[in-house]
Amino acid sequence: MGSGMSQILPGLYIGNFKDARDAEQLSRNKVTHILSVHDTARPMLEGVKYLCIPAADTPSQNLTRHFKESIKFIHECRLQGESCLVHCLAGVSRSVTLVIAYIMTVTDFGWEDALHTVRAGRSCANPNLGFQRQLQEFEKHEVHQYRQWLREEYGENPLRDAEEAKNILAAPGILKYWAFLRRL
């Protein structure tokens, strides 16, 4: 959790509160946009575009209502060829949940494959049970409309995210490793 931000897809990173204030690391990864999702989320650095979502890391916190604005923020950043850091305090639950919703929207992945994609880049990724339930509901009832909205709003995705994510999951041993961990 303290080893720096993790690249999930090209131009998309997950990190913690400390990473979001590390100007050198942000510059090195060409981060121009930061999505902060924690109790005291607010802009902290000059020259960075922010989306701040005040949210607690509790199972009762509704993150679903922030999916659309988060997806729009991340996608517009990446379409401009820039990089976005999504962070909460530890970079484990809230930020991971928003990135999973984004991956589900830009690919045909369900929430579990999207989680495995995130974990391939950030092994500590672990949305709380309430957020997992919200992602399951998003998969069942809303993700298809979000995919359609994204296509209508931005056209076909030139970022090749589905291909990138499938390559991540196809890496030797990734799914076997996560299946093993699930049994523990």
UniProtKB/Swiss-Prot annotation:
An annotated Gene Ontology molecular function: protein serine/threonine phosphatase activity
GO cellular component: cytoplasm; filamentous actin; leading edge of lamellipodium; plasma membrane
Lipidation (N-myristoyl glycine): 2
EC number: 3.1.3.16, 3.1.3.48
Annotated family: Belongs to the protein-tyrosine phosphatase family. Non-receptor class dual specificity subfamily.
Annotated PANTHER family: DUAL SPECIFICITY PROTEIN PHOSPHATASE 22 (PTHR45948:SF3), DUAL SPECIFICITY PROTEIN PHOSPHATASE DDB_G0269404-RELATED (PTHR45948)
Protein name, UniProt field: Dual specificity protein phosphatase 22
Native organism taxonomy: Eukaryota, Metazoa, Chordata, Craniata, Vertebrata
